Amino acid sequence: VFGAGIAIGVYFENSRSSSIQDLYYDYEITVSDVSASLDILSSSNLSCTETWNNLLTLNDNVYNTAVKLEKYDASNKITDELIVLHKRYDLLRTILWQQFILAKNKCGEQRNTIVYLYQYKDPSINTRGFQTAMSNYLTDLDNKYPDKIVLIPIAADLNVISLDLMTKLYGVKGYPVVVVNEKYKFENLSSLSSIESYLKLNIENSKTNSRSF
């Protein structure tokens, strides 16, 4: 029985190591794709529509790959190895956030950026519950307005220097928080419904402005 227990333990440890290795492989492919794509975007004369479409595709690819990591997080103890891997994905998302800002400055606000900054390491029980509610609300919002918003979730407590600089630039002082269009911050459950109210107003204003040309 003791020998069988050791064998089972070794099997699960090997399986865990293999899963993490697969996540690293996925990350390496994703970061290479993002890097090459951004180089092409910066050196080409793509139209604004093409630029936005490419950035949206990259954001979707990063999100879909990171979902695997989130599922692994949910079923395993958070280790230093997982934190490092998560930090790499959060850096990618920060880079994409920067690129969306550049695209808006160049081409206009074709989408509303909704950046969800949350606690990853050791959130309290209350914070964990709050973040679950916030995440569910934003997911529903993303499904309701799929062609109007860009949702970018980023763990904000992993010491990503570029992210820390951006949060200081936009006056973010605590987490979790939702930053909409780099202008408005929503920090509690009672303010979440205001996000949709703002989006509706902004979408309507965009329609009015487009009709005036």
Where are these regions (language model features)?
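Soluble periplasmic/extracytoplasmic beta-strand elements of cell-envelope proteins
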Residues: 113-117, 177-179
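C-terminal regions of proteins
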Residues: 164-170
